[in-house]
Design a protein with these regions (language model features):
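Glycine-rich nucleophile elbow surrounding the catalytic serine of serine-hydrolase chemistry
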Residues: 214-224
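Gly/Ser-rich "nucleophile elbow"/oxyanion-hole loop immediately N-terminal to the catalytic nucleophile
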Residues: 174-189, 193-216, 232
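Serine-hydrolase catalytic core
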Residues: 279-303
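Short beta-strand element of the alpha/beta-hydrolase
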Residues: 86, 97-108
Length: 303
């Protein structure tokens, strides 16, 4: 009798009621595992990289590699899907063992016309000086993110914050479909893949822990790499403090007289400002905001 009653009840549940139930479940979905799961999935694949150059600089040996770090195109809407990162390793004379500094660097695979652009956040001279002064192996991971990227339905290829903002728009538009759409996910994965390369190439230095740094969105990627990869021993992000991101953005808006700073324009342009305070934005922040990881099994990495 109970089974029959349940069956009859199901016949009269409206599609709207079913959609509401799915929506309620979606509100509570745990997204803090997404970046870590993505990183782990890449470790099951052979590492694809090649040595481009070795050259001796005063006080430091520089080794340049090309790393095909991953294939990333959520639902096939992003191209090119293969990510290529430059990995430059600076080994100073009498290098210290165990720890290496990893610099998440900018640069472009192409500038829209097929021409690569060298990284400018940290150049070769600066990285060499850091390695020599600290006797620390320094690893630069460039083209993070890969750019420019073409998104289906968008006429102009996107780079930097324009690309991040559009990836957020995809996620917010359909969290279930585009759960892995945030550009910070492959950005963090690029760094973890560079760790794998470094461990293979730096056996003499016995490197097994990494101090990760980067500027702006690469600083954000440094946070997320530290949370998702146990090989990170410390993180030094060069970025504004946006921990507790939703509250920070609300405070920013009020501080600018109920307006946004110029640097926020790519996100304003994609309508992200209209989503702050919504359940959809809160779901995005479960993946993006480092403080949301405090009460997870990764929370100890923030302490």
């Amino acid at each position: 009798m109970k089974i029959r009653t349940l069956y009859m009840a199901m016949l009269f549940i409206s599609p709207a009621g079913l959609a509401l139930s799915a929506g309620e479940n979606n509100k509570n979905i745990d997204l803090t595992h997404v970046i870590s799961d993505y990183r782990i999935s890449l470790t099951s694949l052979p590492l694809d990289y090649s040595l481009l150059e070795k050259k001796q600089r005063p006080g430091v040996m520089l080794q340049r590699f090309n790393l095909n770090s991953q294939t990333w195109s959520p639902q096939g809407v992003v191209s090119p899907e293969r990510w290529q990162n430059g990995v430059d390793i600076y080994i100073p004379d009498s290098a210290r063992e165990k720890n290496a500094l990893v610099v998440i660097n900018n640069g472009s695979n192409n500038n829209g016309s097929g021409t690569p652009v060298a990284p400018t956040n940290f150049n070769e001279e600066e990285l060499s000086r850091i390695a020599i002064a600290t006797r620390t192996v320094v690893i630069s991971v460039s083209n993070v993110p890969n750019q420019v990227l073409s998104y289906q339905g968008v006429t102009t290829p996107l780079g930097e914050d324009n690309s991040v903002a559009y990836s957020w728009k995809l996620f917010i538009g359909d969290t279930h479909k585009y759960q892995d759409a945030s550009l910070h996910i492959p950005m963090a994965a690029s760094v973890s893949q560079a760790f794998r390369l470094a461990k293979k190439e730096l056996t003499q230095q016995n490197i097994n822990k990494f101090i990760v740094t980067g500027a702006s969105k690469r600083g954000w990627a440094a946070w997320l790499t530290a949370l998702s990869d146990p090989d990170v021993g410390a993180v030094v992000p060069f970025a504004m403090d946006l921990l507790n991101t939703q509250k920070s953005l609300e405070h920013m808006y009020q501080s600018y007289g109920k307006n946004w700073p110029v640097a926020f324009y790519p996100y304003y342009n994609q309508g992200i400002d209209q989503q702050v305070g919504t359940d959809k934005f809160a779901r995005l922040m479960r993946l993006e905001d480092p403080l949301t990881y405090l009460n997870t099994d990764m929370g100890d990495r923030l302490k």
